Each structure stands twice: as C-alpha cells, then as structure tokens.
Regions:
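Function-dense linear segments that define catalytic or interfacial modules
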Residues: 327-417
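Structured DNA-binding interfaces in DNA transaction proteins
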Residues: 416-441
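Conserved "right-hand" nucleotidyltransferase catalytic core of DNA-directed polymerases
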Residues: 1-9, 14-15, 31, 38, ...
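Short active-site oxyanion
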Residues: 65-70, 237-239, 368-372
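Cytochrome P450 catalytic domain signature, combining two hallmark sequence patches
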Residues: 89-91, 209, 257-265, 388-399
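Short catalytic helix/loop segments, enriched in acidic residues and glycine
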Residues: 18-40
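Active-site-proximal helix-loop-helix substrate-binding element of RNase H-like nuclease domains
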Residues: 32-57, 63-166, 178, 407-412
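Short active-site loop/helix that positions an aromatic residue
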Residues: 76-87, 101-103, 248-257, 377-391
Length: 441
C-alpha cells in the first residue's frame, strides 16, 4: 500500500476564501481555480505540478490511487478537491490535523505551522500571503516557482509530522475512524429535498414574525407588535430602536420569564447586562427553547434570520450545488466526541417543537436505501460498561434497571425508590463522567 502525501494551492481573495465561506461552497464555487499541487509517494522526492486544469487532471490520472492512502494536513479540503474536481478515489484518507486534535487536545493549535514546531520538523513558509487575489496566469515565473517550493515544503512537513505521530503509537483503529469521517464528506451520496426545504423556510419565516408579535404582546408592547405587522422599513427601524435599549430589552425578557444575562464589565469591573451580539450568554438566547425569545433577540441585533432560517437556507444552498457532504469533525471535544463543522451541525438538528424533524426529513437516502433515525438510550454508558467488562452494570442495563438512580442511591446512602430527580442527575453525571476519566474530586 502506497502513501501519497498531497497539498493543493488554490486561488483565493478577500471575499472568496475558507475564512469567509465553507469548504463545501469554496470547492464547488465557480471561482475555484487550482494554482498547483505537490505530492510525495511514500518517501520519494516531492513533486510540484502546475498548469491548466487539463494538465492537472492528466498528472493526477497517472498516480496509483487504487493502491494508496492519501495524507494531507486538512484532508477535508484537499480530499474534496481530489474527489469533486478530479474524480479521485483512493483506498483511504489520512489527516494529520485530526490526529493532532486527538493527541494534543482540542485546546491546542493543530495548524501545520504549530505542528511543525511541536515536532521540530521544519518551518512553514509564508508565501501564501503573497497570493491573495492572484490567479495562476498572473504569477510571474519566479513567484510561481517560489509558491511551488512553499507547497512542497508543506507536503514534507505533513509527511514528517505523520511519521512522528505513528512512531508515538497513534492507534491504527483511530485511523479507520478518521477515514470513515472524512469519506462521508469527500464522497457524498445523500440528496436534499429542495422543495421540502423551500416550504419549511417559508413556514419558518412566517413563524418568526408570529413569534415576535406574540412576544411583544406578551410583554405589553402592543404598539410595537402592530408596527411590526405593518412591516415597512421605517416601522421596523422603530421596533429595533426600542429593542436596542438594554433596560427595555431586559424588561421584555423578564416578561417572558427569562432573566437577562449578566457579565463583568472589563472597563468598570462591575456587573453589567450581557446583551451585546458577541456576548456568549446572548448568543445562547438566540437558541433559546422559547421561539419568542429567539425572535426578540434576532430582532434586537437586526438579523433577518433565526437559527432555523439560517440552517434551512444553508441546506437549500448546498442542494443547488450537488450531493450533501456530511461534515463531521473527528475528535471535536476533549472527550473524543465528534462535532459539527463546515457551518453545519447535523448532531443538533431540531427534534422537538414546531421544527422537529423538518430538516432531518429533507435529507434523502440514496436510491435503494432508507434512513433509520434512532436515539439509543444510554448508548455511551452501555457501550463503555461492556467494553470495560463491568458486568454488573451491563446486567443492570439488560434488566432495564435505572442505573443512574442506583448510582445516586450509592452516593447518598439511600434506597433507589427515594432518589429524587436532582439526585438521579448526579448519578447520571457520575456514570457518564467516569466513562471519560472524571475523578472523585
């Protein structure tokens, strides 16, 4: 089995870049252009390739993909280019960025530059900073040669970092999980129901307006509710002006049984309302379980969309560009759990309330397949108990016993039938936390 380490250099500018749009949109965009790529087969000399798209395709077609694993530092990006732009499908995918999160934690930088320093394998160049807004044909021969050297260096860094990681004992089983995670994105097979999404978006917009009117009426702002219904720009501006008052907005939240969040002012050192659009507590209100609160907050910051609108519109945009790549981030949390990425979080689609299942049902299985939507009870605790050989816990699960109450009873020195809901929560936290190495303190 060969190892092909690869890195693509592509056109980008101030508005069209991975910092502005998702990987999916960037790679599928009509402005996409390959400047060049570098590849290294096993430990052979690294090669830089540039030229027309036809030339790039011709060179790629000569490489032994059928008998190779592909390695990159951000394989979601480079793999998508290989698959979507050039029809490449290797034996599997490897990714040093994913491996870095698992080895060094999600709170550490896993950029190629940081990893190169960590493993003392060299230094990442900065030539890419000179390529902003420059298409391939506008590079001078000297600049293009320097860009090629920069790209080859990235490949060498990635290859050497990978070798160090494997020598440190990175579990081979985890490599398969990384491959499966990346393959769901790089080789998409799901479709999106555009018509269902359109209908849901229209319903969501109507719901938002109704929720905001309901919220304004609930807090005694009947005049604002009427103006919002009228809907012209001048009246909308007046509604937002009122909502921008911290004192009035806090009072409105209180009218909906929600306490306005508080933060410590970095200027005065005293408590103040945390109602700025960048305050984390305020962001949480944008996802509040009460849609009236969501609508109030969205109106306050002048946004045109609630979270559900944004999600639905994003799905619609993807559906216009092709199959639906499933974006999951391997080792997204310190526990090792997967997480959402690329502006989509499939683990957090609504399952309750007015929008329950709407987006899920718009995701279509390939012909000949069906989706099974399941919420397996205590799946993590059951699996960990089985893998660790804790037979008493496995048996308790098999017998349908409430293991969280059993743990709580042991903690509080009482009987299972006397455990309160709060006590059960402590028992649940203990069992789940212990599975991730939580200590006694």
């Amino acid at each position: 089995m060969n190892l092909i380490t690869i890195d693509f250099e592509t056109y980008y500018d101030q508005k069209y870049s991975l910092t502005k749009i998702s990987t999916e949109e960037y790679v599928r965009h009509d402005r996409y252009e390959t400047i060049g790529f570098a590849y290294k087969i096993n430990d052979e000399r690294c090669v830089w390739v540039t030229g027309t798209n036809e030339h790039i395709q011709k060179v790629l077609d000569t490489l032994p993909w059928d008998d190779s694993l592909v390695l990159a530092h951000n394989t979601m990006f480079d793999g998508a280019i290989l698959s979507w732009r050039y029809g490449v499908k290797p034996k599997g995918w490897l990714d040093t960025m994913s491996m870095g999160r698992a080895l060094h934690g999600v709170d550490q930088s896993v950029s190629l530059a940081s990893m190169a320093v960590r493993y003392a394998v060299g230094e990442k160049g900065t030539e890419v900073m000179n390529a902003v807004g420059v298409g391939r044909e506008f590079f001078s021969p000297d600049a293009l040669a320097k860009y090629g050297a920069y790209c080859r260096n990235d490949v060498e860094l990635t290859y050497n970092i990978f070798q160090h990681m494997m020598l440190s004992g990175f579990p081979k089983g985890e490599l398969k999980l990384i491959d499966l995670t990346l393959s769901m994105f790089i080789h998409p097979v799901l479709k999106l129901d555009t018509e269902a999404l359109k209908a849901h978006l229209a319903d969501t917009v109507a719901q938002k307006k109704a929720h905001l009117v309901s919220a304004l009426q609930a807090v005694g702002k009947q005049d604002l509710a009427v103006k919002h219904i009228l809907g012209d720009e001048e009246t909308q501006a007046e509604v937002r002006k009122t909502l921008m008052s911290n004192v009035q907005f806090a009072a409105m939240l209180k009218g909906l049984d929600v306490e306005a969040p508080i933060k410590i002012s970095p200027t005065t050192g005293k408590p103040t309302l945390a109602l700025a659009k960048n305050d984390e507590a305020f962001k949480e209100l944008l996802e509040h379980e009460d849609p009236r609160v969501q609508a109030l907050c969205a109106a306050r910051i002048g946004t045109k969309s609630t979270l559900e609108e944004t999600r639905t519109q994003r799905f619609m945009d993807i559906s216009k560009r092709g199959a639906f790549p499933v974006p999951l981030r391997y080792y997204a949390a310190h526990t090792g759990r997967w997480g959402g990425t690329d502006s989509v979080n499939l683990q957090n689609l609504p399952s309750r309330g007015a929008n329950a299942g709407k987006l899920k049902k718009a995701i279509l299985a390939p012909e000949g397949y069906v989706f099974i939507d399941a919420d397996s009870s205590s799946i993590e605790a059951r699996t960990l108990a089985w893998e660790s050989g804790q037979d008493d816990l496995v048996k308790a699960f098999a017998n349908g016993e409430d293991v969280y109450k059993i743990m709580a009873a042991a903690i509080y020195g009482t009987t299972v039938d006397k455990v309160t809901d709060g006590g059960r929560f402590v028992g649940k936290t203990t069992i789940l936390g212990a599975g991730y190495g939580m200590g006694a303190a």
